[in-house]
């Protein structure tokens, strides 16, 4: 591949898996994130574990800061002078009853998941105008399925998917392809609490996957490598599910996790029996 790539949120989880797969494809990868210690540890692990002609650099970056994102793009493109691949992976989650959700919670999720992705796509596209490139945003099946107790997160990912489609339509003339990947549940740092303490929710996810298993970060990375390469050169504006078939069925039931955090009285004020997928 021998291309330059930027992966936001590349220090852990799906972002780490994406960086590893891009390095395996001989890309010159820069991972970005807010915590330098996390990035340094990730870079050391990648350098030690990935055997290829790829390379790894780090840059501290808060994706909600447009100037910081432009600086990160410049770092990623520095050695070659151009950026070939940008992966807008940085994101946060939030869950809880709609009636108790605050506008601050919604705003904070949108700020990272939508504005942060916008900053990344725009900065990368500005660099790619002369030579083209591939931009991939990491969305979620939540953007397609919605679901109870996920109003902030699901709406942010739905907005991200439409941002991708709109950007793809405008940027195609520059030879820039823009797509998103909608992962299903992936075992990573971000989902560790569910795997360790809420196996019933993971089981519910599996029941709604035709393939019957959860994903690995590297499987999302494989999809990124395909979207970044010549094999997908006629693909743009697409929201691609990498989810074991989950979007063929329904959203997971998060009620047990939410109910565990509330008293019966609190819960009765926020949700009514029979309103869930199994009700």
Where are the regions that the model predicts?
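Active-site loop-to-helix junction immediately N-terminal to the catalytic Tyr of the SDR YXXXK motif
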Residues: 101, 146-154, 166, 194, ...
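C-terminal helical subdomain
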Residues: 180, 200-235, 242-244, 270-279
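Active-site helix of classical SDR
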Residues: 121, 156, 164
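Substrate-binding pocket helix/loop in short-chain dehydrogenase/reductase
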Residues: 97-98, 105-107, 205
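Residue(s) in the substrate-gating loop at a strand-loop-helix junction
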Residues: 140
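Alpha-helical segment proximal to the catalytic Tyr-Lys
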Residues: 126, 169-173, 233
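Conserved glycine-rich cofactor-binding loop
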Residues: 11-13
């Amino acid at each position: 591949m021998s291309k330059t790539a930027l992966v936001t949120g590349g220090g852990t989880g799906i972002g780490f898996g994406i960086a590893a797969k891009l390095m395996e494809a001989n890309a010159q990868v820069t991972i970005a994130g807010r915590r330098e210690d996390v990035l340094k540890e990730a870079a050391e692990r990648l350098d030690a574990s990935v055997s290829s002609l790829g390379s790894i650099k780090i840059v501290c970056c808060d994706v909600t800061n447009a100037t910081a994102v432009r600086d990160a793009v410049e770092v990623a493109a520095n050695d070659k002078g151009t950026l070939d691949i940008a992966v807008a992976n940085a994101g946060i989650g939030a869950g809880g009853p709609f009636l108790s959700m605050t506008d601050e919670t919604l705003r904070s999720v949108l700020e990272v998941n939508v504005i942060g992705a916008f900053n990344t796509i725009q900065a990368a596209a500005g660099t790619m105008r002369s030579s083209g490139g591939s931009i991939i945003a990491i969305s979620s099946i939540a953007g397609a399925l919605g679901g109870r107790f996920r109003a902030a997160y699901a709406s942010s990912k739905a907005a991200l998917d439409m941002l991708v489609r709109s950007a793809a339509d405008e940027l195609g003339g520059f030879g820039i392809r823009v797509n998103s990947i909608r992962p299903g549940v992936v075992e990573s740092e971000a989902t560790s609490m569910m795997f360790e303490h809420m196996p019933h929710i993971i089981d519910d996810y599996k029941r709604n996957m035709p393939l019957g298993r959860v994903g690995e970060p590297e499987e999302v990375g494989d999809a990124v490598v395909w979207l970044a390469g010549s094999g997908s050169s006629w693909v743009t504006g697409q929201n691609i599910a990498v989810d074991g078939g989950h979007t063929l069925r329904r959203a997971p039931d998060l009620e047990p996790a939410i109910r565990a955090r509330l008293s019966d009285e609190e819960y009765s004020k926020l949700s009514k029996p029979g309103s869930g997928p199994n009700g």
